[in-house]
Amino acid sequence: MSGPPASIHTTAIGDAELAWTEEGHASRSGRTAIWAHGLTSSATAQETVGMFDWSPVTRDHRLIRYDARGHGRSTGGADPEQYTWPNLGRDLLGLLDSVSPDEPVAGIGSSMGTATLLWAAVAEPHRFHHLVLTTPPTAGQVRAAHVVAYRAGADLIERSGLAAYEAASAGPPPAVLSGLADARTPIAVPESLLPSVLRGAARSDLPADVELRALRVPTLVLAWSGDPGHPLSTARRLATVIPGAQLCVADTPGQLREWPQGVADFLDA
């Protein structure tokens, strides 16, 4: 991100207030993009640590960045069901009613944000003209171990606090992130809500293949290697199941740095 800090807007979605910003300028009709971040992150955290840089997108698009329910500046409640991926997809559609009510948008997501986009897109595909699915999360049978870890993490926070959870979940980043000074984005969920957020993630999975096969939205899948939390198996599944989807895999930091311009080019194609 560059330039002065963006103004924070809020939109009421059910019983939550979602915080969002906008940057860039739509050069013509239909040039709005929306960024959906990963679990426990926030609208700008992944860019702040240098993981992504969406400035190429903002040169020709109005880019909406928003904090998911319970994350960053957005509010949320204690019910884990609020944080399931289908419900986060409904939140996103509600936000689109406010930020782009009359035109479809380009959706760009990361991990939980990728899942959010997919649930929104299978529900209302006409709301999107492009999908960019970065670092898809675990899914299906591969997800089982992570479900156990999410539930155990929620219990640990309630029993021993956030610091204990952070220590237990610390680990080396994948090699593709080795060039970053700190590849771990700070947890942007209040400690009081984090157990609910994790339990919501534990209840979640991607849409069924039959729903994904029905999508007719140009889709780019961006994955990196060496990360069990974002396995190539999910990325390959999405690229196989979604009609016409393209897959690009980054194995090195240099390849990762090519993603932002690649996304801008994909949206312009």
Predicted ranges, named:
Residues 228-234:
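Conserved alpha/beta-hydrolase "acid-adjacent" motif
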Residues 181-210:
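Hydrophobic, aromatic-rich cap/lid helix
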Residues 244-269:
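Catalytic active-site module of serine/aspartate enzymes centered on a nucleophile-bearing elbow/loop
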Residues 115-158:
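Flexible "cap/lid" loop of the alpha/beta hydrolase fold
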Residues 2, 13-75:
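Conserved HGGG/HGGXW glycine-rich cap/lid loop of the alpha/beta-hydrolase fold
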Residues 37, 109-111, 224:
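Conserved alpha/beta-hydrolase "nucleophile elbow" surrounding the catalytic nucleophile
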